[in-house]
Amino acid sequence: MTFYRTTRLMLSGVAFLSLAGSAFALDGQDLLKKINAAYTLQGGTIAADGVDVDGTTVTLKNASFKPNSGAALPIGEITLTGVEEDEDGGYYIEEAAFPDINTTNDGATLTATGLTLGGISIPADPKGEGLDSMLLYESAHSGPVKVVKDGAEVFSLGGSDVNLTLREDESGFDFDGAFKSLKADLTKASDPQSKEAIDKLALQHINGDITMKGAWELTPGTIDVSEFAFDFTNVGKLNLAFKISGYTMPFVKSLQEAAKQAEANQNKEEAQQAFGLSMLGLMQQLSFESAQIRFDDASITKRALDYAGSQQGMSGKQMADSLKAMTPIMLAQLNIPELQNAVSAAVNTFLDDPKSLTVSAAPAKPVPLPMIMGAAMGAPNTLPQVLGVKVSAND
């Protein structure tokens, strides 16, 4: 998408420039109106007691977010800097800064600082076609986030960043995100059984990162999430990846319209049924291309086997041997002979030496989602073959 910048006329008369200055002043109310015109398609609107304009800075006073259904959520003062009106009547905002959060509920206090969105494009007409009709942002950032209960910090996040980059040829987007230094204190668990499990598994203090990376190609509607990883110290790394096609701009518009109609219907039961039917229709456009789930162990497997074994009066090794013996018996009931041996071999390899376990699906050609749903309901044992499922360990 091309982010048009406001054209600045090169005029030679200083007096004329002075007179023209007011003509090019930003219209704060028009900006808010167009933000809401685009945002209502995504779930709500923003209200403000006042809109102040100072050069290219627009301040939304005492702002609140009102979902299409539900109570308004107070936000406070939102500062929009580097605001420019595009030639087509849309807007570009260099940065939107939100007030810090400090709220207490049920004895727990949540604080969050440094909340910003960057490179925001507000469409002139959200009902139009193409990227110019979408509300987009280039980056989202938060500083430290903390949850404190009874004087102790039970959760914290060092910070987060999400980036959305339009390709030069406007064929699609690349995106990535990182939620760094996520920490959770589980020592305050009140349930005795939960506390015992936490202690045995050495999960009293969890520390790790969540990262993601992917791309969206607009014409075929291909969303390729190559990384959605949960990486925790002394636990392991779980990575989810998937690729689907058919998620095109018209699909997005249809999805938004279906959601809007459901929100507008006062009969919620009827609205849910109508939305469900709409979703079934839209699902016809989506196809599954590939998926992978991979776990790289960082010592949690041995502790889990030891704990599970202790609950059954056996050692961790005995529990592992028991699982290896049970796996082929359980798989035999599923009637998937082409996968049974591979799964059993992978489980045996992993339990003997826990390093990694991978489940992947890569059909020879994209499979329409309705076909997958039909197979799941009518002949679930055919799914591994339809999707090209493979299981491996320590590779």
Which residues make up each language-model segment?
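Bacterial N-terminal signal peptides that target proteins for export
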Residues: T2-L11
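N-terminal signal peptide c-region/cleavage motif recognized by signal peptidases
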Residues: A15, A20-A23
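Glycine-rich, small/hydroxylated-residue low-complexity segments
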Residues: L26-D395
